[in-house]
Design a protein with these regions (language model features):
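N-terminal subdomain of nucleotide-sugar transferases
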Residues: 1-87, 225, 233, 274-280
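Carbohydrate-associated surface elements
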Residues: 212, 230-231
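Nucleotide-sugar-dependent
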Residues: 262-265, 313-317, 325-351, 357-369
Length: 436
């Protein structure tokens, strides 16, 4: 199959964010000369260069901030960057988040959102330099992701200029939560909804992250979405796939990934549940948190140990060495709106690892529905620490149940998320719209 030249908007290839991991796995094996990315400097880090090494960084010539916020931004040079392996595919561990970044992301931006300024203080334009670069690259097709207003509007601008078919891929239901606070929330919700619908109208193909999302978006937007979730390299994960379900003297439950919207409170709930379980068990259970930042509550619990993120290449071994993998979603209304139709990138990776999965999440989420249907996880759908503790205890005491849910998970992952099958279907979709 002859593969077209693709221009990717607003999402780099990386191994520390779901959108980047999914992107890398979907486009793996593509000719590097036929892939380029346009993105802001804010997400230009921890790059995976195995698939793509050509980037245009949206700097001060395109990324414009209103006064006085323009004085608070670092000066970034616009233009093409050729990325080497250093700091990319060979070292994809997340960079240390600075105190400045924490303050800006956790306090400053939420404050701006509340007072109604966040969605209007910056925009991305098409500079003469960027247009020239796009003309020289001359893509056949556009692939885009967006999660904030400025990137959404930029997708419209880019499609209008390039005049080539566009594929728009939605990773989670951010349209439902992008404007939920402050006196101007209705204004921004309606405005962004209109801009999103314009992007959907301009797109030749629409992609969702789950079947549940595709069904919901058909009702909400009247559009047909095809589902493409993160595929997995079966052989890569089989290199350390767990096949022994006996427990050691200190059983471990591992959570590896991000802490943020939709995944916060349930992590501490797990620590509290383990404290309850350990009162009844001879061999205490330990909770390993492998995250970028150490939560403030960790030191309150003797059962919890925080570890830094590891290179992506080490994950099969790390997952297989754990006795259980924890897959949580928070139960707040805001969290449910955000994650209801999502399928976390780590889900198929957890599944194929062979390690039993404990899921603590609302019953209405796509993730829980699929897990219950396939019986590939021990699922707790009530926001109850005692019930979570009871589920943990049941799994610790039942090797048969541990083995059954783990084998189900492996089988379904190999059938549904096999990268060879998913990638071939993805290529057919892209090649098909270029030929039209």
């Amino acid at each position: 199959m002859s593969l077209p030249k693709v221009l990717i908007l607003c999402q780099p290839f990386n191994n520390n964010f779901g959108g980047g991991i999914t992107l890398a796995n979907l486009f793996s094996g593509w000719d590097k000369n036929k892939i380029a990315v346009v993105c802001t400097s804010h997400i230009f880090n921890n790059l995976n260069t195995e698939v793509c090494d050509t980037y245009y960084v949206l700097g001060e010539e395109e990324h414009k901030w209103s006064f006085p916020f323009n004085y608070m931004q670092r000066k970034v040079v616009s233009g093409e960057v050729k990325v080497s392996n250093e700091g990319g595919a060979e070292n994809p561990v997340a960079t240390k988040i600075t105190l400045r970044s924490k303050i800006v992301n956790n306090y400053f931006y939420p404050f701006l959102e509340y007072i109604g300024l966040f969605h209007g203080i910056s925009k991305i334009t098409l500079s003469e330099k960027l247009c020239k670069w796009i003309d020289e690259y001359n893509p056949d097709v556009i692939y885009a992701q967006a999660g904030v207003r400025e990137t959404l509007v930029f997708c419209l601008l880019a499609e209008s200029y390039i005049k080539k078919p566009m594929i728009f891929h939605v990773m989670d239901d951010w349209p439902s939560t992008i404007s939920q606070k402050g006196p101007f929330k209705k204004y921004w919700h309606n405005k962004i909804d209109g801009e999103l619908r314009a992007v959907l109208d301009k797109s030749e193909v629409l992609l969702s992250i789950s079947d549940a999302m595709a069904q919901e978006y058909k009702k909400r937007y009247g559009k047909v979405f095809k589902t493409f979730h993160n595929p997995i390299e079966i052989d890569f994960w089989k290199s350390h796939q767990r096949n022994n379900y006996e427990l050691g003297k200190t059983p471990t439950i591992l959570y590896a990934g991000r802490i943020g919207t939709g995944i916060q409170a349930t992590l501490e709930s797990m620590a509290q549940a383990i404290d309850i379980v350990n009162k009844d068990l001879v061999n205490p259970v330990h909770f390993i948190l492998q995250t970028n930042d150490k939560p403030a509550w960790v030191d309150k619990y003797s059962c919890v140990q925080h570890k830094a993120l590891v290179p992506y290449a080490d994950l099969p071994k790390v997952f297989a060495e754990a006795d259980f993998l924890f897959l949580p979603y928070d139960f707040s209304e805001e969290s449910i709106r955000y994650i209801k139709y999502s399928m976390p990138t780590k889900a198929p990776e957890y599944m194929v690892s062979g390690t039993p999965i404990i899921m603590f999440a609302p019953a209405e989420t796509a993730l829980v529905i699929e897990a219950i249907e396939g019986n590939w996880a021990k699922v707790v759908t009530e926001n109850s620490i005692p019930k979570l503790a009871e589920a943990i205890k049941q799994l610790v005491l039942s090797e048969n149940e541990r083995k059954q849910i783990a084998l189900n998970a492996v089988r379904i992952a190999e059938e549904k998320f096999n990268s060879e099958t998913v990638r071939n279907n993805f290529r057919k979709v892209i090649a098909g719209i270029v030929k039209q």
